[in-house]
């Protein structure tokens, strides 16, 4: 029924394909077609699967313990693709709670919170030439366009596109964003997180479904088609990935089975400044959960690179050096980068890290964290400060544009102007520049040339 080697590596914190064990999978059991549901809930007294196929529990479907390792499973006959479901647990305290499947491939459109049965197999890719020639771009131009697929452009009723504010679908974006990215000379499109998230305003940085491409823009195979189209136009796709924390919404990972499966047992370590919950990456099963998520998107969606959000919070507890190194999370990063360099050697691994921790892009074998690139956040902040100043006073602050060279060769850096610098009223790049509009235009031109030639 299950691959015992995968189960062993799952509990050992080294599993790259935990999604083959857990979640909802079509199978034929004793001549009957249906779906096998499996979940990891070590603290639950009992577990059920509830959904459209059993009237949300009116006909109970109690799951069986597979072993003593906290795994529950059940085969349910007659379940169809797109059927909605959840797992129902009796907690150690005797409460009954319903949870979305952490390993679900597809989710109900918000504000709904159920998981959906989905068949990931069958999409025919047309990007074999792209994949064959793909590299990590160490010795060729790398020009990345960062965008949220939801906020980049929305439909307008006045133009006959749909309701005002309605999102474009993955397929519709093929004819919208890809021509723009290509025309502007970008080599890669970096999409802000696509893993399922409940609140539009988070832009995807507070996730619930780490295997579920958000249903806001369509179905998983439509996302595959979008990425396939990017590749056929010579555009790589980088995906923002959020390994540090997750939302505390009641249907999600927080206190998944009534206990702390994914979160810290220690209250003082548990909650983040973003009103979310930190992953406890000292737990092997959590390591396997996130390792497998990255591998899943690389395999099934042909993602060309991952930009890892808030790496400083993985290096130090809460991103604070005074709180000490987050040993569990750093071990996870080393395992991740080591595994990915072996199994997906041309996929870029990019750290968004604001610390001065050494060796972020040094190979794991040389006692580094193993990333391919690190965002140079210090360069971005210093450069923008310099260009905001009146030119009369810049002679006194030349260190803003020279200091970066003092550390530039210590890591393999990417220079960036990210969404963090233009949100919450911080102004667009052009409006950060000194002077009147004509002055600002000239400054922006100088800024981008400086960035390219740095």
Region locations from a protein language model:
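The feature marks proteins involved in alpha-glucan
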Residues: 1-32, 36, 66-146, 151-165, ...
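Short proline/glycine-enriched turn/loop motifs at strand-loop junctions of beta-rich domains
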Residues: 40-47
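Short beta-strand elements bearing conserved aromatic residues within extracellular beta-rich modules
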Residues: 47-49, 85
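Short, acidic Ser/Thr/Gly-rich low-complexity loop/linker segments typical of extracellular
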Residues: 58-70, 382
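Conserved alpha/beta catalytic core and glycan-binding cleft of carbohydrate-active enzymes
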Residues: 111, 304, 316-454
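Substrate-binding/active-site clefts of carbohydrate-active enzymes
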Residues: 130-139, 148-303, 307-325
């Amino acid at each position: 029924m299950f691959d015992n080697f995968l189960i062993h590596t799952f509990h050992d914190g080294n599993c790259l394909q935990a999604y083959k064990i857990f979640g909802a999978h079509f199978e034929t059991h004793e001549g009957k077609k249906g779906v096998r549901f499996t979940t990891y809930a070590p603290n639950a007294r009992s577990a059920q699967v509830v959904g459209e196929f059993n009237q949300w529990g009116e006909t109970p479907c109690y799951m069986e313990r597979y072993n003593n390792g906290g795994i529950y499973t059940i085969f349910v006959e007659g379940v169809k693709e797109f059927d909605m479901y959840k797992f129902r647990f009796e907690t150690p305290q005797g409460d009954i709670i319903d949870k979305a499947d952490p390993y679900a491939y597809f989710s109900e459109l918000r504000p709904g919170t159920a998981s959906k049965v989905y068949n990931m197999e069958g999409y025919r890719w047309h990007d074999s030439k792209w994949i064959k020639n793909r590299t990590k771009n160490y010795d060729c131009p790398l020009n990345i366009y960062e965008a949220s697929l939801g906020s980049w452009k929305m439909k307008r009723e006045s133009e006959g596109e749909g309701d005002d504010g309605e999102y474009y679908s993955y397929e519709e974006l093929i004819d919208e964003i890809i021509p723009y990215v290509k025309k502007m000379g970008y080599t890669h499109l970096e999409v802000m997180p696509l893993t399922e998230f409940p609140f539009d305003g988070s832009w995807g940085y507070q996730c619930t479904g780490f295997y579920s491409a958000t249903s806001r823009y369509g179905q998983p195979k439509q996302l595959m088609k979008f990425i396939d189209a990017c590749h056929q136009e010579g555009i790589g796709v980088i995906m923002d990935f959020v390994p540090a924390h997750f939302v505390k919404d009641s249907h999600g990972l927080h206190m998944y089975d009534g206990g702390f499966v994914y979160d810290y047992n220690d209250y003082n370590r548990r909650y983040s400044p973003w009103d979310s919950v930190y992953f406890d990456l000292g737990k092997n099963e959590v390591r396997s959960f996130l390792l497998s998520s990255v591998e899943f998107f690389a395999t099934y969606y042909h993602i060309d690179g991952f930009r890892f959000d808030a790496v400083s919070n993985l290096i130090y507890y809460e991103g604070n050096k005074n709180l000490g190194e987050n040993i569990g999370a750093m071990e996870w990063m080393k395992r991740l980068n080591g595994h990915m360099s072996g199994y997906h050697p041309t996929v870029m691994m990019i750290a968004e890290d604001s610390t001065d921790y050494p060796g972020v892009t040094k190979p794991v074998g040389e006692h580094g964290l193993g990333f391919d690139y690190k965002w140079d956040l210090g360069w971005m902040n210093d450069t923008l400060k310099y260009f905001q100043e009146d030119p009369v006073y810049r002679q006194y602050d030349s260190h803003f544009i020279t200091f970066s060279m003092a550390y530039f060769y210590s890591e393999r850096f990417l220079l960036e102007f990210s969404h963090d610098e233009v949100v919450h009223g911080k102004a667009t790049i052009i409006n950060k520049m000194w002077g009147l509009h004509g002055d600002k235009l000239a400054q922006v031109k100088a800024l981008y040339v400086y960035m390219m030639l740095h």
